[in-house]
């Protein structure tokens, strides 16, 4: 989302650990030079994470996944992505995620969450693998806030009907809830990343055999490509875009004295505002960081859904809103299906999204884009794919199906919901209107032609449209270092 140019030393960006006891003051070495504050996880833990075999964080691919991100036209790329095969040392488990940063330090926040969330989740899974007493010792249900209490009650309701869920789901849900809680605390205590008006979204997918668990914070999105009874490829949205105008989200924000409204020049974009100040105008209801709004209804509690995979399910697309702002779910699914190979599928989606930005928002600079494609079908190829980072192949199993979600706003996904926690997937039939030059199923334009258009070619589109910024302004009581007029370049 927004862009940032920080004076922080580049080595700071590589630090990815908890800092609850790290000193926040600058220490002096005997030589008289200033020394940076120590970070608890800046040493062995981070080196261990970076050396994990099967972990991809940059543009590349493996036998079961591909990743691609492209910087927008406003500076530093604030999107981050992750594929971690053999997660928790399980050959049947894969963790995928995309993270969309915003604000002055958004690029640092998104990378921090990308690096530390899997590490913390792995630790929590080992801790909560026992009985309910172990989760009690972890503090998940001790002295909860009103937000945690709502989520915990929802979890307890799920436990009353365990027949709907496999054995792995509830421990994983507990671990993911606790992980996000700890992740936000770690960001608040970080000595070098100022998260007061900076944050990130997060969409994580954990695939374990036939089971799929999706955790969502913010407005990034996960979409499943599957086949219907006629063997036609359809898109099923696995997450809800957690915007401030959702009824339950808006109600919570108002209870906490925050405000939700849209500006006159962008009436379709609801934003979160401080009670007595027209700032910061955050365009999402949940996020890591953004502590200026945490007392006014913004939360970092993930919306967690469960899905049972079937043999008809083909692949999952995770992407930031730089993609979904200009492409529909069905269009993204069709682009991946039309890609020359699995290795280029994620790049094909990003390239098409960049072209669509030029068409849909000709007066604005395109947003950062990040895409992760996780393929669910088995591959018969024997060798591994050459990539920029070494990865292991984890065998994927074909599966059978039921879709279950605990979200309160499932109607916003246009799903037919029942009184239980079971929902019917959304089969996207209607496609958003897109320019004919970039329509995937156009009679005259192929995918290859669409993504090969020259940059200097003239574009025709609606005039007067502007891109949506995640964050509009910095509160007046923000730290003096960032209150200069130059902050606008970060939005």
Curated annotation (Swiss-Prot):
Mn(2+) 2 binds at residues 100, 321, 367. Gene3D superfamilies: PPM-type phosphatase domain. Mn(2+) 1 binds at residues 100-101. Its cofactor is Mg(2+); Mn(2+). Residues 17-28 have a biased composition (Low complexity). SUPFAM superfamilies: PP2C-like (SSF81606). It catalyses: O-phospho-L-seryl-[protein] + H2O = L-seryl-[protein] + phosphate; O-phospho-L-threonyl-[protein] + H2O = L-threonyl-[protein] + phosphate. One of its GO terms (molecular function) is metal ion binding. This is Probable protein phosphatase 2C 6. It comes from Arabidopsis thaliana (Mouse-ear cress).
């Amino acid at each position: 989302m927004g862009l940032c140019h920080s004076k922080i030393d580049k080595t700071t960006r590589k630090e990815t650990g908890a800092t609850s006891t790290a000193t926040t003051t600058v220490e002096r070495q005997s030589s008289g030079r200033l020394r940076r504050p120590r970070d608890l996880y800046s040493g062995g833990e981070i080196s261990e994470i970076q050396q994990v075999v099967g972990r991809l964080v940059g543009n590349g691919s493996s036998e079961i996944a591909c990743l691609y991100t492209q910087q927008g036209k406003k500076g530093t790329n604030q999107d981050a992505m992750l594929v971690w095969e053999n997660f928790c040392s399980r050959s049947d488990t894969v963790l995928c995620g995309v993270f969309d940063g915003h604000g002055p330090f958004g690029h640092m926040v998104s990378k921090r969450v990308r690096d530390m969330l899997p590490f913390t989740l792995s630790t929590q899974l080992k801790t909560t693998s026992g009985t309910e007493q172990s989760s009690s010792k972890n503090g998940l249900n001790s002295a909860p806030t009103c937000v945690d209490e709502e989520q915990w009650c929802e979890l307890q309701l799920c436990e009353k009907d365990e027949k709907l869920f496999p054995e792995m789901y509830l421990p994983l849900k507990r671990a993911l809830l606790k992980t996000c809680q700890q992740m936000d605390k770690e960001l608040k205590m970080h000595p070098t990343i100022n998260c007061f008006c900076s944050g990130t979204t997060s969409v994580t997918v954990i695939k374990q055999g036939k089971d799929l668990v999706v955790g969502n914070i913010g407005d990034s999105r996960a979409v499943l490509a599957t086949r219907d009874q006629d063997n036609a490829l359809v898109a099923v949205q696995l997450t809800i875009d957690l915007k401030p105008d959702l009824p339950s989200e808006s109600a919570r924000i108002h209870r906490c004295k925050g405000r939700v409204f849209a500006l006159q020049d962008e009436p379709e974009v609801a934003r979160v505002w401080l009670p007595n100040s027209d700032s910061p105008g955050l365009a999402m209801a949940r996020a890591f960081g953004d502590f200026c709004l945490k007392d006014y209804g913004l939360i970092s509690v993930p919306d967690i859904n469960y899905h049972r995979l079937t043999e008809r399910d083909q692949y999952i697309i995770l992407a930031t809103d730089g993609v979904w702002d200009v492409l529909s779910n069905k269009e993204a699914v069709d682009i991946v299906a039309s890609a020359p190979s699995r290795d280029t599928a994620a790049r094909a989606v990003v390239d098409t999204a960049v072209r669509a930005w030029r068409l849909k928002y000709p007066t604005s600079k395109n947003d950062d884009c990040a895409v992760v494609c996780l393929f669910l079908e088995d591959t018969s190829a024997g060798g591994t794919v050459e990539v920029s980072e070494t990865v292991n192949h984890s065998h994927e199993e074909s599966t059978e199906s039921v879709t279950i979600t605990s979200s309160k706003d499932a109607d916003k996904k246009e799903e037919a919901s029942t009184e239980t926690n079971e929902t019917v997937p959304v089969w996207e039939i209607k496609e958003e209107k897109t320019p004919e030059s970039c329509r995937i199923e156009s009679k005259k334009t192929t995918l290859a032609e669409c993504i090969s258009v020259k940059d200097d070619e003239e574009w025709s589109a609606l005039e007067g449209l502007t891109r949506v910024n995640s964050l509009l302004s910095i509160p007046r009581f923000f730290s003096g270092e960032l209150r200069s007029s130059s902050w606008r370049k970060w939005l």
